[in-house]
Amino acid sequence: MRLILLGAPGAGKGTQAGFIKDKYNIPQISTGDMLRAAVKAGTPLGIAAKKIMDEGGLVSDDIIIGLVKDRLKDGDCANGYLFDGFPRTIPQADAMKDAGVAIDYVLEIDVPDEAIVERMSGRRVHPASGRTYHVKFNPPKVAGRDDVTGEELIQRDDDKEETVKKRLSVYHDQTEVLVGYYNKWAESGQPGAPKYRKIAGVGPVDQIRDNAFKALEG
């Protein structure tokens, strides 16, 4: 099972990625993790990436694709792999295709923006314990207070409505084009074209999980 997960930030990709990894016994490929590992190991690509990052630059797609190809040679990728958060742009998707990175499925988790804003901006956290609440879906017994200690709950900066809306805007501008890109490729019937599947990311987590598994079996 070799797949790419697509969806806006807050669509629940991370949750579903966990279920898919466990079911198919495949690793989640994170470009951030790969970069850190390559820099730490001092590989040629890692050294090149470190030089760019130290200068405050963005690591090129060529280096990222090189890291991806190296990572896919590892033994834990024998059953496949899962990409979440990569590719983010058409040039990255083209580079993956040109490098011969095989993909069986592209799974899009579709959630309306207003549902994502409600889901993320309603989160509240008890900093000391990490306990999380939601003002609507999982409220504390006393508004704004942790159930166990009675201490104040906070809203993380990442969960503030304006931040969530900004991230969604970046997604729609830069990454949403991949939906059309992979849809078109899937419909082309070309050798090596992936199957494109879209599921709704709203509703009970277990139901979304079951729908994801069903989509990846057809």
Swiss-Prot record:
Documented EC number(s): 2.7.4.3
Annotated pathway: Purine metabolism; AMP biosynthesis via salvage pathway; AMP from ADP: step 1/1
Single GO MF descriptor: adenylate kinase activity
List of residues binding ATP: 10-15, 123, 132-133, 203
Enzyme class: transferase
Region of interest (NMP), residue spans: 30-59
UniProtKB keywords: ATP-binding, Cytoplasm, Kinase, Nucleotide biosynthesis, Nucleotide-binding, Transferase
Record CDD domains: ADK
InterPro entries membership: Adenyl_kin_sub, Adenylat/UMP-CMP_kin, Adenylat_kinase_CS, Adenylate_kinase_lid-dom, P-loop_NTPase
Example GO BP: AMP salvage
Short name of any one Pfam family annotated for the protein: ADK
PROSITE patterns according to UniProt: ADENYLATE_KINASE (PS00113)
Family: Belongs to the adenylate kinase family.
HAMAP family found in the cross-reference section: Adenylate_kinase_Adk
Function in brief: Catalyzes the reversible transfer of the terminal phosphate group between ATP and AMP. Plays an important role in cellular energy homeostasis and in adenine nucleotide metabolism.
Protein name: Adenylate kinase
Organism: Herminiimonas arsenicoxydans
Gene coding for it: adk
